[in-house]
Amino acid sequence: MIKRKIWCNLCIDLVAFTSEIFKGAVFQSLDGIVVSANCKLRKIFTLKSKPQDTADKDAVCGVPFSTDEPTDIIPRSCQLMTDVPHVTQLLNMTKLRQTEIKFGGHPLRSAESDQFINRGTGSTRNSKNQDVCHIAFGSKVLGPPPLSGRRSNMRISSETVRSVGSKNNRSCQPSTVEKHVNGTEMSALLIPESEEQGNKENIHHIKQTVPIHAANLPIMHPHPPQEPSADKNNNRRRLRLKSTSRERTETPSGNSSGNNTNEVKAATVLTTVSQQEAGLLNSSTLGPQSPDQSDEWIFPENADHVSYLASSRQSLLLDDDSCHPSHLWLEASKESEHDQQAEESQSVPKDIFTFSSRPRSAPHGKTQTMSPEEVSFILDLKEDNSVTSRDTQSEDDFYGGDSSEEGDHSIQGSRGPTTGPSELTQLTSESLLGEAAKRTSKEYLKSAYTEAGATESQDSSAEQIDRNNFQMSSLPTTCFSPTGRRCGSCQKTPDPVIKAKDLPAQQVPASLNKTSLKEISGERLSSIPEASEYDWRNYQPSQMSESELQMLASLRRQQNEELEDAGTSHGLSASQVDNCNVSISTSSDDTTTWNSCLPPPVNQGHHYQKEMNPPSPSNPRDWLNMLSPPIVPPSQQPAEQRPDSSESLSVQGEEDLSVEEDEEVLTLLYDPCLDCYFDPQTGKYYELV
């Protein structure tokens, strides 16, 4: 019936099969395909009309091809090369009936095909139930239900009914059990629910114990076996194409099992060539992949050992609003590995990528997660410019899922030279799908990405990269920053030395020569009017503005994560714990911390880490109940302050890299309220000479 040893574009007319098998039904769409045969599939696609049948009419079916129907041309990207011998065959009910008569059988009537196709419902339905209408795979079909008892049902499904060509050949040869497959076979039946449970244990077996001496590759209608099979649970391997939200096993012959009453015209083209060599079936070609095996993208140049299926939605499925007939094209190869590779370079364009997916049911209530391999491939696709808008939309579904919000999944915003999988995930979503703040409800990542982008041009040390890694923490943490306060004197007395443009939300460390500095004594420090007016009780969080509370929340979380990474305890003094009583809950911290109207600060507060060490006698600020240099929000800063040319502001993150052995250079923090510089190492105050 179907030619062997040659490339074959097998077109299956699903419209004809649907209307003949299910009386009154109209074909609408194809939800899935089950391939159960010893063949290799090259491509699957749909056509609006039937292609021209180029096979030998007399040898194949004895029926001339009707030329009055509209024909379609196979797309250029899916055509075989002209120097490759191939045929195009069209299968419909008319040709099947003619083949039956030619090989001496009786023509298959619709009632018989209806009975065999729907035999699976008999085991679950009471045989006494003789309704005028019965349910065939979810659709109501006119006519009495098929008469099927359990014994005949088991006997029929044990061989998963052969078609005429294979049935005729097999009747001439002894049916002895062999350990190899000497031919090809494609099942034209949906496995009924009752039998599918029994067959599930044998799905992953590789050896096929039932002999198939078939000269052809049948994809025909079911027929009862002439003799019972030696193995009742035939080891059948199913390759499944997932397409729409409802998954079901579908045969190439078009026995659509879902909405048969709403089905639109389509025909399926199957390109298949049988394998000649006897031996074990290649489980990577046909067998379902094991559940722990991940899906993989297969490139044309290195995919010669895998039977891959182009399952992209735009090529496999009709759009919901399309009412045109379509074809499904399955190709199969018989060549050896070397010939396959040579032919693949001819027949498969370089820009066609395929994705092979293992059979599984659709997840309920869960979104899909991505493995790092798939994430890295998305980056390659972006460079290839081969991602369509539809693909990007599906990737958007991936990144909107739960995987980016797991508590222990660290999402890092750094762009270091070595990026882990979680960094890759975030960077990919940023480059493909917009800014990272839209990817997760943890909106404080927005500030992390802004900081990472702002310091990328100045970044010269690995420590800077490390400190830009802001990771998610699902627990509220203790505050490691001192309580900020409003600095009223900053706005009244602008300093000519330090201007506000270089003072983001924190004090920038300045490397100054010690010869240009003069230490301020304790008496002099206490005599400064701004310092004497300060009382920390006036600046508790209850009197803070919302923006200051937000900065404290972010700073506290930041410091806690940095110290957690280092594995050290916070070692706060009692005064710092008392002063930092900003209560932050997990829920409020997640979504309402940052408002888009506030510009996120650049790397705020990272230099405070030195002050978070356990209190020591060399740091009197811990014992004197004094606070660190205040956090000045951008709205509170004087607008006209700028640094003098006499001081050089070091790049943040190089603070530890400054020459601390040389006592002539000090790394100081400027305190605008006290109008002096503070040395976090010694706790001393300095002013410019």
Curated annotation (Swiss-Prot):
Composition bias type Acidic residues, residue spans: 394-405
UniProt biased composition (Polar residues): 150-176, 343-359, 411-421
Domain of life where this protein originates: Eukaryota
Ranges annotated as biased composition (Low complexity): 583-593
Region (Disordered): 143-179, 217-236, 241-262, 333-424, 583-660
PANTHER family, A to Z: ORF PROTEIN
The protein's name in its UniProt record: Protein CFAP20DC
Native source species: Macaca fascicularis
Gene name as annotated: CFAP20DC
